[in-house]
Amino acid sequence: MRFLSFLIFVFAVLGLVQAQDQSGFISLDCGLVPTEITYVEKSTNITYRSDATYIDSGVPGKINEVYRTQFQQQIWALRSFPEGQRNCYNFSLTAKRKYLIRGTFIYGNYDGLNQLPSFDLYIGPNKWTSVSIPGVRNGSVSEMIHVLRQDHLQICLVKTGETTPFISSLELRPLNNNTYVTKSGSLIVVARLYFSPTPPFLRYDEDVHDRIWIPFLDNKNSLLSTELSVDTSNFYNVPQTVAKTAAVPLNATQPLKINWSLDDITSQSYIYMHFAEIENLEANETREFNITYNGGENWFSYFRPPKFRITTVYNPAAVSSLDGNFNFTFSMTGNSTHPPLINGLEIYQVLELPQLDTYQDEVSAMMNIKTIYGLSKRSSWQGDPCAPELYRWEGLNCSYPNFAPPQIISLNLSGSNLSGTITSDISKLTHLRELDLSNNDLSGDIPFVFSDMKNLTLINLSGNKNLNRSVPETLQKRIDNKSLTLIRDETGKNSTNVVAIAASVASVFAVLVILAIVFVVIRKKQRTNEASGPRSFTTGTVKSDARSSSSSIITKERKFTYSEVLKMTKNFERVLGKGGFGTVYHGNLDDTQVAVKMLSHSSAQGYKEFKAEVELLLRVHHRHLVGLVGYCDDGDNLALIYEYMEKGDLRENMSGKHSVNVLSWETRMQIAVEAAQGLEYLHNGCRPPMVHRDVKPTNILLNERSQAKLADFGLSRSFPVDGESHVMTVVAGTPGYLDPEYYRTNWLSEKSDVYSFGVVLLEIVTNQPVMNKNRERPHINEWVMFMLTNGDIKSIVDPKLNEDYDTNGVWKVVELALACVNPSSSRRPTMPHVVMELNECLALEIERKQGSQATYIKESVEFSPSSASDFSPLAR
């Protein structure tokens, strides 16, 4: 299938259609002049307007007149970009809304060079696709489904070689947020088919969302159609023509087969199949079939299309194929009297968008600064100010923290011919550390809001002769306490300020040099001491028989005697908890609260776990791993001393045992993100990598600020650093959270932790126990999948939340969790991917709490019961 190639034919002149509502449509005829006009394209009845208000660069042009009669009017003009490497369209939209975005590129020898262009297309800071024009009269269409992360969107054309980027039309169509849901990334269209041997191609207004449908019917199938109306009112709103036609096998006793292939065998796909029974079956007649994938994997069992009503079946988690081939077989069951059918098929490829946008407020501020000071002609000031780093705006420095948006940390507009007052928009750059506005023609007062910019340490306003020299009182206080340096011109009695500041900076620099020298000397001595005697673990003699096969722990750091443990716990006065390892007590050490875990006098395995935990915690440090304060290895007395986590474990907080306050959805997402970051650090930040092996809510502890930290590393195992992805080990863990593949094979990998974490995510969403024999499906994984067959997310969400959450965000978490608990470890995501997804879910909730204008439809789609296989589709 070459769907995008077929799309070019759609832009040929079609028959007239009737008008429908185009609310929310953005239809741009790129390069249209005069820019103020709009027109209605006759063959589609879509209203187009110029792109001029969405972009401030580029040159209008028109395709050669000889080609114009072959295409719809919005293709005749175009905009090319001979200047600058990146040129971007800017849209102000609503965050979290879902859009179909389509760019069309018809060369038509507009420049008379007969030179076929190639360039890249970006969505925000991420590459969307490479555009290569196949012929003078041909072109390219790029289409994707994308959820906005912020309330602005940039679509950029990036020059990659000697040819000039251009664009013919750009179209945005709002979609229902409950449709085309992914665990991550956006969707690029591979094919959108309805089953007919002949045209027409379908788009608006037959498709209210202006999706483009291509007719398709191969010689192994025949056409089934009806003149009766079909109910298409589920979330996907397929056109009537799609619903009223279907493909069935030529031989009614044979299965229906649909095959396609993708060039990129690593790509992930989502498949949407639309079904409706369009024959009037008698009472003793049945159409029932199974859907299998690539030779036997069950996709859907005993499926019966509803009578004259569309139902959509899709995979809740992306699928891939080892060789890039996708083969679907629709086979009659033994109960069926009629062959299988299918009415419509949509195939999408996942486009991951790993690069986060710069903070929204900072982007808005920079756009305002660009407009206020007339900086639109700066060729690099296009698109996202910081991302990707290769295209960062000239004059900016940015920081790029892990799993967080880029931040603008310095702005240099020195000598930029700025005039007028200093805009207060600069104060919205909350991460800004240095601001240079020197050598311009700025006037007016120094904004008092600069004093509220807590990260700002340097302001250079020198060379602005018309700027008011008075300094706001609040800003002067920061200058006086040395938290901010202000460089400005002075006259008269204050003329020495710049010199004084320069001298002060020089003095500080000299002190820093001296301190650096002292630090190097001290550090050198420390290394000499370390070289003379290691302060880690060494082999020694063990007194207890229970430890006869293990080394003792000998270190000079963090080691306490048993009497010191008695003192810090006041003779074990207050019990915090009990477990198989022993008892945890409250303690105080140097006026700091601690938790003391005393190991019971038991087996050699207990000591091994104790030793493993000490060894791990002495060498790993992360803000989301419980910190080890020290340990006791005194005769038969073994203890671990941890930082005290005031709010106890996650299970206690979810159940209400620790507090009557219900954990909000935002807090739950924050806890999930932080626990995932701790786990991701064990997998990727440690050398050698570590597997926790016992991830569960009771091992996720919360401090007084509800910050989450992973605890209990007694079962943790390390991996060799030679590329091994798994090790064979005796199965250990907690029933209900144990990876079934690990249990079956004894092969342990990081994906075993991913499985356990997926179970924890389901508990966070549902507040249900992992095992409950009174449920129809005892294990929480099976119960969630069973409950979601009706597409109603509310049926599983913790009722204590009182529906105070973003439904789309909950769906994303549940689908991520179900991907984590996939029985096959190879199909589970990695922890970095989990962290990225959860960060997006947290951002959705934070934006909702801050008053986002986005609205979502919460109804669910009716859906036939599915089997509980790996690929059971979810409905919504």
UniProtKB/Swiss-Prot annotation:
UniProt KW keywords: ATP-binding, Cell membrane, Glycoprotein, Kinase, Leucine-rich repeat, Membrane, Nucleotide-binding, Phosphoprotein, Receptor, Repeat, Serine/threonine-protein kinase, Signal, Transferase, Transmembrane, Transmembrane helix
Signal sequence annotation: 1-19
InterPro entries: Kinase-like_dom_sf (IPR011009), Leu-rich_rpt (IPR001611), LRR_dom_sf (IPR032675), Malectin-like_Carb-bd_dom (IPR024788), Prot_kinase_dom (IPR000719), Protein_kinase_ATP_BS (IPR017441), Ser/Thr_kinase_AS (IPR008271)
Coiled coil region boundaries: none
Membrane topology type: Single-pass type I membrane protein
GO process annotations (BP): defense response to bacterium
Positions glycosylated per UniProt: 45, 90, 138, 177, 251, 259, 284, 290, 327, 335, 397, 412, 417, 455, 460, 468, 481, 494
Binding residues annotated for ATP, in chain numbering: 576-584, 597
Transmembrane segments: 501-521
Residues that bear Phosphotyrosine: 642, 742
PANTHER family recorded: OS07G0107800 PROTEIN-RELATED, PROTEIN KINASE DOMAIN-CONTAINING PROTEIN
The family this protein is said to belong to: Belongs to the protein kinase superfamily. Ser/Thr protein kinase family.
Protein name: Probable LRR receptor-like protein kinase At1g51890
Organism name: Arabidopsis thaliana (Mouse-ear cress)
